[in-house]
Amino acid sequence: MRRLLSVAPVLLWLITPLAFAQLPGITSQPLPGGGQSWSLPVQTLVFITSLTFIPAILLMMTSFTRIIIVFGLLRNALGTPSAPPNQVLLGLALFLTFFIMSPVIDKIYVDAYQPFSEEKISMQEALEKGAQPLREFMLRQTREADLGLFARLANTGPLQGPEAVPMRILLPAYVTSELKTAFQIGFTIFIPFLIIDLVIASVLMALGMMMVPPATIALPFKLMLFVLVDGWQLLVGSLAQSFYS
């Protein structure tokens, strides 16, 4: 037994290199186009790491921000803080985001993922081609004033066109533009419901019913107005069209 214990470290030292030799190493292979293709472990590591950035990409590089803010402002304008619930609004915003972003996703799949899966391009080229449709989408929704603001803050000088806008300037400019657009849409939504609140409050004051909360009386009229104008179809359709106009 003692001999076995004394020999065990030596056997372990001899077996370890053989065991690691069976594992696929971190290697790169040249591609026909002149690029390089990394081994499967590296690609798997990059893929798993990229999954952690999906929430940030969903929030900051898609139409999700504008949609969820508008839905939240609509709920406040109606005076129903818990209806629809957060889960319903998030689900509707996610599906609407997928619908709006589907042309961008299709372009990324065709231009970047398919050639990369067929080993026609390298991982770096796939990332560059996959980022291009997102850049074009964000540039269409970003105001020039916001781009100029962050370009001045970054001291990059005058930009020589859309292709010269770096991501570190485009991302905050896009988010700022989306916030402004969402609040503009929210202001438009608030106006008819605010008029109903003012009318109900004035009527209650004229009747001497100061103890009756105006929000309780105004809520049925707000819901009736929203249903009569087919508010959900109008709002969802306007949101979708705002990204293509």
Swiss-Prot record:
List the transmembrane segments.
45-65, 88-108, 185-205, 209-229
- GO CC terms of this entry: bacterial-type flagellum; bacterial-type flagellum secretion apparatus; plasma membrane; type III protein secretion system complex
User: Which Pfam families would you find in this protein's record?
Assistant: FliP
Signal sequence annotation: 1-21
Q: Which UniProt keywords apply?
A: Bacterial flagellum, Bacterial flagellum biogenesis, Bacterial flagellum protein export, Cell inner membrane, Cell membrane, Membrane, Protein transport, Signal, Transmembrane, Transmembrane helix, Transport
- Tell me the membrane topology, using the record's own terms: Multi-pass membrane protein
A Gene Ontology biological process annotation? bacterial-type flagellum assembly
Q: According to its UniProt record, where is this protein located? A: Cell inner membrane; Bacterial flagellum basal body
- The yes or no answer to whether the keyword DNA-binding is present is no
Q: What is its main location?
A: membrane
Function of the molecule: Plays a role in the flagellum-specific transport system.
Q: Which PANTHER family does the annotation name?
A: FLAGELLAR BIOSYNTHETIC PROTEIN FLIP
Q: Which protein family is it in?
A: Belongs to the FliP/MopC/SpaP family.
Name the record gives this protein: Flagellar biosynthetic protein FliP
* Organism of derivation: Escherichia coli (strain K12)
